A protein has these predicted regions:
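Class I S-adenosyl-L-methionine-dependent methyltransferase catalytic core
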Residues: 1-69, 73-223
């Protein structure tokens, strides 16, 4: 699809209410995200495939020796992830930074992003989910988050109201910290019925490390 065809497709959204499924990603965000994850996971750029485009059918793409790095419709993300997991497709996908996707916490890894203003004007708390990481459950890289947000806006920070051993994607502040999959105790919804989106009960040690990372980044932390 050419740039002109892409712009023409985007134009039909102009007079409609904006939703995350109507978003299209600024080129500077695409390039920055690709650079970061190609470096983080040693991805060969020639192997990247972007199956989510007007008229595309991700279920019938040829994924042989490919890695998906794309921004899919968020409303279909759980179905897409399940399809890729079932078929052994490697992926790094944009996702809603508040809700995440499915509760496959033993299989997926979330990279904290930030608020991105998409080219249709929608402001979306954007994170990234992948199945290419066997040990880390949540990765927070302050430099990545800061630079991502500066590409389109100044962004905002989320106020955390959870205990030191509780975490959700939306409450991970911009700092340098990694949660290992082995440090997850259980899904947070087993003890916090008021919690929204992907979240975990984690070990005290992981919570203390997170506190220290946030303190170094200049945030007020939990006791």
């Amino acid at each position: 699809m050419t740039d002109e065809e892409y712009k023409a497709w985007c134009a039909h959204f102009d007079d409609r209410p904006k939703t995350t499924d109507d978003c299209y990603t600024p080129r500077q965000v695409i390039d920055f995200v690709e650079d970061y994850f190609c470096s983080y996971y040693n991805i060969d750029r020639s192997k990247i495939i972007r199956p989510f485009y007007p008229g595309g059918d991700y279920e019938h793409e040829d994924y042989t020796d490919k890695v998906v790095l794309d921004n899919p419709p968020f409303s279909l993300l759980a179905k897409i992830v399940q399809f890729y997991q079932k078929n052994g497709v490697k992926f790094v996908l944009y996702c809603n930074g508040t809700t995440g996707t499915t509760k496959m916490h033993g299989l997926l890894t979330y990279h904290i992003g930030g608020t991105v203003i998409y080219e249709n004007g929608a402001r979306v708390n954007t994170a990234f989910v992948t199945n290419m990481n066997e040990t880390e459950a949540i990765v927070s890289d302050r430099d990545f988050s800061d630079r991502l947000e500066k590409l389109t806006n100044k962004g905002t920070r989320v106020k955390c109201q959870y205990e030191i051993d509780e975490i959700t994607l939306a409450t991970v502040k911009k700092c340098d910290w990694v949660l290992l999959k082995s440090e997850i105790i259980e899904d947070i919804h087993k003890t916090r019925k008021d919690s929204f989106g992907i979240g975990y009960k984690i070990t005290k040690e992981a919570g203390i490390r997170r506190n220290e990372a946030e303190r170094k980044a200049g945030y007020v932390t939990r006791n």
